[in-house]
């Protein structure tokens, strides 16, 4: 079938298998050009491994180090001529490329928040890897059903204490709009922490440790985004910020646990990129469009694979990691360059419907958004029929 992009709001409801595969190959090629990652991990578990930063971590570990990988994700398979999700096709392509190079790859498809998927993952580690020496936690989800209580918690994107008016882009109509966000209630804050805080990461590490599948010296990291002044009302001072502070508290306990066996636990702060999650946040399309414009002009623009490849080389497996005062690993240094942030802030209120395409890189933002779903990738013939029914080998469901 011939597959074209169909966008509704912040979701593209179609995906292109060949485009997703080409995107994965592009990321692999980038890692290969950078050369081997010295002293990297050998057996890696990535929780949230099918898109964005999690996929980039799996690619960097496998093709930069030669690591065996086990990926956990929650994706929809193709069925009845309906394409699967982008993460499904990304993972299928990853498996194909890993197999071609003789790299061990296993995947588990299901709800990472559940005890069932944790148990299946532990069984797969025992069978295929024995133990893991790196656990990457890269889960982005709007809701979580707690495995112990059965309660489903829904996260919210709201300020705390007062309403906030945010500028943004109505991406459907390509117009500047303002959104008034009301403050989160205490229950909404607690629910957001339950979904996006550190509890599930801790549950994973506790379960892996109790099962004896964490190697001595194992490291774990959880990916997060903090941002700067423009985004602080939402990301640090809002309901999501409370979840991020919970992540900071959680990592201290995990670090103590792993340090006793020569290991480490860190929160890794990465730069803002286009993801399905970030595109749903009212201000982020405008912020990202401005950030792309400014960073591309300075030749410092990076995507997921550049960020995570650099994180492994320069911090996670470096003798001189980039660490902030709270002990977080920082890969967002170029985004937070004072000159970059000052320019973004200067342009923020100048953007109008008429100059959207000149003051910002909204065109680049839209292109990156479509790339998430396999569209707009160089070398792919989008007028040619493509087979949507792609399977993932070594998949546990």
Swiss-Prot record:
| Keyword annotations from UniProtKB, A to Z | Fatty acid biosynthesis, Fatty acid metabolism, Lipid biosynthesis, Lipid metabolism, NAD, Oxidoreductase
Write down the NCBIfam families for this protein, in alphabetical order.
EnoyACPredFabV, PRK13656.1
Q: Which reaction does it catalyse?
A: a 2,3-saturated acyl-[ACP] + NAD(+) = a (2E)-enoyl-[ACP] + NADH + H(+)
What is the protein's name according to its record? Enoyl-[acyl-carrier-protein] reductase [NADH]
Q: EC class of this enzyme?
A: oxidoreductase
Q: Where is this site: Plays an important role in discriminating NADH against NADPH?
A: 75
What are the binding positions for substrate in this chain? 225
Any Pfam family matching the protein: Enoyl_reductase
GO MF annotation: an example: enoyl-[acyl-carrier-protein] reductase (NADH) activity
**EC numbers, comma separated:** 1.3.1.9
Q: Which gene encodes it?
A: fabV
In terms of PANTHER family, this protein maps to: ENOYL-[ACYL-CARRIER-PROTEIN] REDUCTASE [NADH]
Q: Which GO terms describe its biological process?
A: fatty acid biosynthetic process
Q: Which residues cross the membrane?
A: none
- Listed pathway(s): Lipid metabolism; fatty acid biosynthesis
Location of the active site: 235 (proton donor)
The protein's assembly and partners: Monomer.
**Residue numbers binding NAD(+):** 48-53, 74-75, 111-112, 139-140, 244, 273-275
What function does this protein fulfil?
Involved in the final reduction of the elongation cycle of fatty acid synthesis (FAS II). Catalyzes the reduction of a carbon-carbon double bond in an enoyl moiety that is covalently linked to an acyl carrier protein (ACP).
User: Do the record's keywords include Methyltransferase?
Assistant: no
> Could you tell me the superkingdom of the organism this chain comes from?
Bacteria
Family under the similarity heading:
Belongs to the TER reductase family.
